[in-house]
């Protein structure tokens, strides 16, 4: 039995609220149960120096957690003077995932910076960030097309992400914090809207997991991501 009484394959309630802030070209509040992340997409003309003159764009991401997004207050990383390894790993993951769904040539020499700020954390912040950031990215691209900055739609497909794991010997989807902290296996999966894999991050926290369990976890992730993409599409429509 899961602490929330969810079935093994059941995700938490997921909501996506677009245009959550006034200034960003794309702005989304994404909620996976009690995990809440603000995702903004900022569109700027021009690209980093290493891409100048190549006729293609760039998508990158930054990630952070507010001091009281967790049960006890943590210091801001800016106050500590450096980002943690975890933060760097997560923002690179978000950036890689989003670059997979954008045609950089169609984007032209323009840059989109995604900022994912965790307001409240209850497990799955990186997967929620990717899911919300994709919708914010779509809005930023539509803004640029509306302004005539880009001519064609650079978006190749929607992407979404979910955590899966083995908890009390059972494969489950969309782990909340109490499950994540006690899971025997923890995995983050990013897929396209058609179920193709973009990235898998999987670790055996206790006992090693079998090939059969891996296939079961990926099947759970695929089904959950299909449902999450439906939420994205409903928000965009």
UniProtKB/Swiss-Prot annotation:
Catalytic function, reaction form: tRNA(n+1) + phosphate = tRNA(n) + a ribonucleoside 5'-diphosphate
Signal peptide positions on this chain: none
Enzyme class: transferase
Binding-site residues, phosphate: 86, 124-126
Entries under InterPro entries matching the protein: ExoRNase_PH_dom1 (IPR001247), ExoRNase_PH_dom2 (IPR015847), ExoRNase_PH_dom2_sf (IPR036345), PNPase/RNase_PH_dom_sf (IPR027408), Ribosomal_Su5_D2-typ_SF (IPR020568), RNase_PH (IPR050080), RNase_PH_bac-type (IPR002381), RNase_PH_CS (IPR018336)
The entry's keywords: Nucleotidyltransferase, RNA-binding, rRNA processing, Transferase, tRNA processing, tRNA-binding
An example molecular function term from Gene Ontology annotations: tRNA nucleotidyltransferase activity
EC assignment: 2.7.7.56
UniProt GO BP: rRNA catabolic process; rRNA processing; tRNA processing
Keyword RNA-binding part of the UniProt annotation: yes
Pfam families listed in its UniProt record: RNase_PH, RNase_PH_C
Purpose of the protein: Phosphorolytic 3'-5' exoribonuclease that plays an important role in tRNA 3'-end maturation. Removes nucleotide residues following the 3'-CCA terminus of tRNAs; can also add nucleotides to the ends of RNA molecules by using nucleoside diphosphates as substrates, but this may not be physiologically important. Probably plays a role in initiation of 16S rRNA degradation (leading to ribosome degradation) during starvation.
HAMAP family attached to this UniProt entry: RNase_PH
Sequence similarity: Belongs to the RNase PH family.
Quaternary structure and interacting proteins, as annotated: Homohexameric ring arranged as a trimer of dimers.
Protein's name in the database: Ribonuclease PH
